[in-house]
Regions:
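HhH-family (HhH-GPD) DNA N-glycosylase catalytic core used in base-excision repair
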Residues: 1-186
Length: 186
Protein backbone atom coordinates (compact mmCIF):
# COMPACT_ATOMS: atom_id res chain seq x y z
CA UNK A 1 0.00 0.00 0.00
CA UNK A 2 1.32 3.44 -0.92
CA UNK A 3 1.00 5.97 1.88
CA UNK A 4 0.62 9.74 1.73
CA UNK A 5 4.34 10.13 2.48
CA UNK A 6 5.39 7.55 -0.11
CA UNK A 7 6.62 5.04 2.49
CA UNK A 8 5.40 1.47 2.50
CA UNK A 9 4.30 0.14 5.90
CA UNK A 10 3.03 -3.10 7.40
CA UNK A 11 -0.53 -3.87 6.29
CA UNK A 12 -1.85 -3.75 9.88
CA UNK A 13 -0.97 -0.07 10.35
CA UNK A 14 -4.18 1.93 9.89
CA UNK A 15 -3.43 4.80 7.48
CA UNK A 16 -6.38 6.77 8.91
CA UNK A 17 -5.08 6.79 12.50
CA UNK A 18 -2.08 9.09 12.96
CA UNK A 19 -1.44 7.68 16.45
CA UNK A 20 -1.24 4.17 15.03
CA UNK A 21 1.08 5.29 12.22
CA UNK A 22 3.42 6.93 14.75
CA UNK A 23 3.32 3.78 16.89
CA UNK A 24 4.28 1.67 13.87
CA UNK A 25 7.01 4.05 12.74
CA UNK A 26 8.52 5.06 16.09
CA UNK A 27 7.85 2.28 18.62
CA UNK A 28 6.77 -1.12 17.35
CA UNK A 29 9.67 -3.49 16.92
CA UNK A 30 12.26 -1.12 18.38
CA UNK A 31 14.39 -2.82 21.03
CA UNK A 32 13.32 -1.75 24.53
CA UNK A 33 15.77 -2.13 27.41
CA UNK A 34 14.07 0.12 29.97
CA UNK A 35 12.15 -1.87 32.58
CA UNK A 36 9.58 0.90 33.06
CA UNK A 37 8.68 0.74 29.35
CA UNK A 38 8.80 -3.07 29.37
CA UNK A 39 6.31 -3.03 32.26
CA UNK A 40 3.97 -0.57 30.55
CA UNK A 41 3.94 -2.60 27.36
CA UNK A 42 3.33 -5.87 29.22
CA UNK A 43 0.30 -4.43 31.01
CA UNK A 44 -1.10 -2.91 27.82
CA UNK A 45 -0.62 -6.17 25.91
CA UNK A 46 -2.49 -8.05 28.65
CA UNK A 47 -5.39 -5.61 28.39
CA UNK A 48 -5.39 -6.11 24.62
CA UNK A 49 -6.49 -9.77 24.97
CA UNK A 50 -9.65 -10.16 22.91
CA UNK A 51 -9.49 -6.57 21.67
CA UNK A 52 -7.58 -4.81 18.92
CA UNK A 53 -4.21 -3.24 19.64
CA UNK A 54 -5.52 -0.07 18.01
CA UNK A 55 -8.25 0.10 20.67
CA UNK A 56 -5.68 -0.16 23.49
CA UNK A 57 -3.29 2.27 21.82
CA UNK A 58 -6.07 4.83 21.51
CA UNK A 59 -6.65 4.47 25.28
CA UNK A 60 -2.96 4.46 26.29
CA UNK A 61 -2.96 7.96 27.81
CA UNK A 62 -6.02 7.08 29.89
CA UNK A 63 -4.28 3.88 31.03
CA UNK A 64 -1.20 5.89 31.98
CA UNK A 65 -3.31 8.26 34.07
CA UNK A 66 -5.32 5.46 35.70
CA UNK A 67 -2.25 3.33 36.49
CA UNK A 68 -0.07 6.12 37.93
CA UNK A 69 2.07 6.38 34.77
CA UNK A 70 2.76 2.64 35.17
CA UNK A 71 4.91 3.29 38.23
CA UNK A 72 5.76 -0.27 39.22
CA UNK A 73 6.04 0.48 42.95
CA UNK A 74 2.62 2.12 43.00
CA UNK A 75 0.90 -0.60 40.96
CA UNK A 76 2.45 -3.31 43.16
CA UNK A 77 0.86 -1.54 46.13
CA UNK A 78 -2.67 -1.42 44.73
CA UNK A 79 -5.28 -2.95 47.01
CA UNK A 80 -8.84 -4.13 46.36
CA UNK A 81 -10.20 -0.61 46.77
CA UNK A 82 -7.85 0.72 44.09
CA UNK A 83 -8.76 -2.16 41.78
CA UNK A 84 -12.42 -1.34 42.28
CA UNK A 85 -11.75 2.34 41.54
CA UNK A 86 -10.04 1.34 38.28
CA UNK A 87 -13.28 -0.35 37.18
CA UNK A 88 -14.74 3.14 36.72
CA UNK A 89 -11.60 5.02 35.64
CA UNK A 90 -12.35 7.08 32.54
CA UNK A 91 -11.13 5.85 29.17
CA UNK A 92 -9.72 2.42 30.06
CA UNK A 93 -10.95 -1.17 29.71
CA UNK A 94 -12.98 -1.91 32.84
CA UNK A 95 -12.68 -5.70 32.83
CA UNK A 96 -12.35 -6.81 36.45
CA UNK A 97 -10.18 -9.83 35.61
CA UNK A 98 -7.76 -7.78 33.52
CA UNK A 99 -7.46 -5.10 36.20
CA UNK A 100 -6.72 -7.71 38.86
CA UNK A 101 -4.26 -9.41 36.48
CA UNK A 102 -2.43 -6.10 35.96
CA UNK A 103 -1.81 -5.82 39.71
CA UNK A 104 -0.84 -9.49 40.05
CA UNK A 105 1.44 -9.26 37.02
CA UNK A 106 3.11 -6.14 38.43
CA UNK A 107 4.07 -8.06 41.55
CA UNK A 108 5.42 -10.96 39.50
CA UNK A 109 7.30 -8.50 37.26
CA UNK A 110 8.94 -7.18 40.45
CA UNK A 111 9.81 -10.72 41.59
CA UNK A 112 11.45 -11.36 38.21
CA UNK A 113 13.42 -8.12 38.51
CA UNK A 114 14.63 -9.23 41.93
CA UNK A 115 15.63 -12.64 40.57
CA UNK A 116 17.37 -11.46 37.37
CA UNK A 117 18.39 -7.91 38.26
CA UNK A 118 16.00 -6.49 35.66
CA UNK A 119 13.14 -7.62 33.46
CA UNK A 120 15.37 -6.85 30.49
CA UNK A 121 17.86 -9.43 31.83
CA UNK A 122 15.01 -11.93 32.12
CA UNK A 123 14.16 -11.41 28.45
CA UNK A 124 17.85 -11.71 27.50
CA UNK A 125 17.84 -15.05 29.35
CA UNK A 126 15.33 -16.27 26.75
CA UNK A 127 16.66 -14.60 23.61
CA UNK A 128 20.40 -14.60 24.24
CA UNK A 129 20.19 -10.85 23.55
CA UNK A 130 19.49 -11.57 19.89
CA UNK A 131 16.69 -10.00 17.90
CA UNK A 132 14.74 -12.68 16.06
CA UNK A 133 13.58 -11.79 12.55
CA UNK A 134 10.37 -13.52 11.48
CA UNK A 135 7.05 -12.55 9.97
CA UNK A 136 3.64 -14.09 9.51
CA UNK A 137 3.37 -15.76 12.92
CA UNK A 138 1.24 -15.24 16.01
CA UNK A 139 3.29 -17.51 18.27
CA UNK A 140 6.59 -19.36 18.29
CA UNK A 141 8.59 -21.78 20.43
CA UNK A 142 10.08 -18.70 22.14
CA UNK A 143 6.70 -17.22 23.04
CA UNK A 144 5.51 -20.68 24.10
CA UNK A 145 8.44 -21.00 26.52
CA UNK A 146 8.26 -17.46 27.93
CA UNK A 147 4.48 -17.72 28.31
CA UNK A 148 4.76 -21.07 30.11
CA UNK A 149 7.33 -19.63 32.52
CA UNK A 150 5.32 -16.48 33.23
CA UNK A 151 2.16 -18.52 33.80
CA UNK A 152 4.04 -20.89 36.09
CA UNK A 153 5.05 -17.84 38.10
CA UNK A 154 1.37 -16.82 38.30
CA UNK A 155 0.97 -14.21 35.55
CA UNK A 156 -2.46 -13.92 33.99
CA UNK A 157 -3.37 -12.95 30.43
CA UNK A 158 0.09 -14.14 29.42
CA UNK A 159 -0.70 -16.77 26.80
CA UNK A 160 1.66 -17.47 23.93
CA UNK A 161 -0.13 -15.17 21.45
CA UNK A 162 -0.09 -12.23 23.88
CA UNK A 163 3.56 -12.86 24.74
CA UNK A 164 4.49 -13.14 21.05
CA UNK A 165 2.79 -9.79 20.43
CA UNK A 166 4.64 -8.36 23.44
CA UNK A 167 8.00 -9.63 22.19
CA UNK A 168 7.28 -8.00 18.82
CA UNK A 169 6.26 -4.72 20.43
CA UNK A 170 9.43 -4.49 22.53
CA UNK A 171 11.74 -5.46 19.68
CA UNK A 172 12.79 -8.97 20.71
CA UNK A 173 11.04 -10.30 17.61
CA UNK A 174 11.31 -8.07 14.53
CA UNK A 175 8.28 -8.69 12.32
CA UNK A 176 7.95 -5.75 9.96
CA UNK A 177 6.49 -7.14 6.75
CA UNK A 178 8.41 -7.47 3.50
CA UNK A 179 8.21 -4.14 1.72
CA UNK A 180 7.79 -2.11 4.92
CA UNK A 181 10.34 0.68 5.05
CA UNK A 182 11.28 -0.51 8.55
CA UNK A 183 11.62 -4.16 7.57
CA UNK A 184 14.68 -6.27 8.24
CA UNK A 185 17.46 -5.76 5.76
CA UNK A 186 20.08 -8.48 5.45
Amino acid sequence: MEWHDGKHRCRWANPKNELYIRYHDEEWGKLVRDDAKLFEMLILECFQAGLSWECILNKREAFRAAFDEFDLDKVCGYDEAKEEALRTAPGIVHNRLKIHAAVTNARIFREIQNEYGSFDAYLIHWTGDAVIHETGKVSSPLSDAVSADLKKRGMKFAGTVIIYSYLQAVGRIESHEDGCFLGYKM
